[in-house]
Amino acid sequence: MKVTILASAILALINGALALPANTPTLDVTLTQVDNTRIKATVKNTGNEKVTFVHLNFFQDAAPVKKVSLFRNATEVEFTGIKRRLLTEGLSDDALTTLAPGATFEDEFDVASTADLTEGGTVTIRTDGFVPITTDRKVSGYIPYQSNELEIEVDAAKAAAVPQAIKLLDRRTKVASCSGSRASALSTALRNAASLANAAASAASSGSSTRFQEYFKTTSSSTRNTVAARFRAVASEASSQSSGKTTYYCTDPYGYCDSNTLAYTLPSSNLIANCDIYYSYLPALTSSCHAQDQATTTLHEFTHAPAVYSPGTDDYAYGYRASTALSASQALLNADTYALFANGTPLLPLSTSTSKCSTLTMVIAVNLNC
């Protein structure tokens, strides 16, 4: 009983440390229709302080990333662009946007380039989530954003004329374009990802409820079973390099890698690609709490692929602080939540191994903003 009380008290301390202060700035997103499926987003800093944030995977990103969610008759329309995992430190200046209090920027994009809207009719558009904020080009926290709900009438013929952002490649073997040191690194990453996912599946289904609550914001048996099932599916997919439900590239077949992108997934094709810095920047397996490595990056990308486990995850938030600020429904579908949970799960039974993210370590990490 004493242990349970202590764990609950520490978890309360963690949640308190992660709570948004009353004066925390937020980003307000106003969506308007420009012409048919072409949309304009106006992003405004509604706070009293200047903020610098990562605009990749957000508005102003030139890549075909998921900027908004589309719904037809309350059912989300499939996204056909890319979802990518980014560095959390050493970010380049061109990945960052700074907004003064009250300042705005605009971004125009065509939602028909990353979704099949050829059916036409009424489509509802909205977005929300968290954007990483930075200090000295390192992610140091997060800022929430939310948009209005925009309803548009789509002209089917005009939508069909919009070029798709990504032209599909021919499917190949599960691990494609791999040779030499990169093939070896990916092989190791897949083995490690499978081990991490299996351990995380056990922890999700029958491990500490306090720890599960920390990441997934609920201890319901149905959520624990769903999380465990996704981890088991990832472990199964990572266990074979000659067959499977995804195609995994050692290199970038579409040209969407840059100096800030570790890897990306094309969910509509269940295709995953590693970028150069996946090999040059990441260790195979980190010993640090909530740090990035090749294994959890691969695990993160597998969760995006709906063929591995449906529905595939989204990128509502990155990093421990933002991911643990999500609601239970968002955490269940947030790729980094799975990577972070797996990162802190011992690979050996708890009797012989302790988590690199012990509760005490996490309290210290939060206080240090790491």
UniProtKB/Swiss-Prot annotation:
Residues 20-172 form a propeptide. The keyword Secreted applies. Its main location: secreted. The active site is at residue 301. Binds 1 zinc ion per subunit. Disulfide bonds join 178-250, 257-275. PROSITE patterns: ZINC_PROTEASE. GO terms for biological process: proteolysis. Keywords: Cleavage on pair of basic residues, Disulfide bond, Hydrolase, Metal-binding, Metalloprotease, Protease, Secreted, Signal, Virulence, Zinc, Zymogen. InterPro entries: Fungal_M35_metalloproteases (IPR050414), Lys_MEP (IPR029463), MetalloPept_cat_dom_sf (IPR024079), Peptidase_M35 (IPR001384). Its EC number is 3.4.24.39. Its cofactor is Zn(2+). The keyword Amino-acid biosynthesis does not apply. One of its GO terms (cellular component) is extracellular region. GO terms for molecular function: metal ion binding; metalloendopeptidase activity. It is found in: Secreted. It catalyses: Preferential cleavage of bonds with hydrophobic residues in P1'. Also 3-Asn-|-Gln-4 and 8-Gly-|-Ser-9 bonds in insulin B chain. Belongs to the peptidase M35 family. Secreted metalloproteinase that allows assimilation of proteinaceous substrates. Shows high activities on basic nuclear substrates such as histone and protamine. May be involved in virulence. This is Neutral protease 2 homolog AFUB_070680. It comes from Aspergillus fumigatus (strain CBS 144.89 / FGSC A1163 / CEA10) (Neosartorya fumigata). The lineage of its organism: Eukaryota, Fungi, Dikarya, Ascomycota, Pezizomycotina.
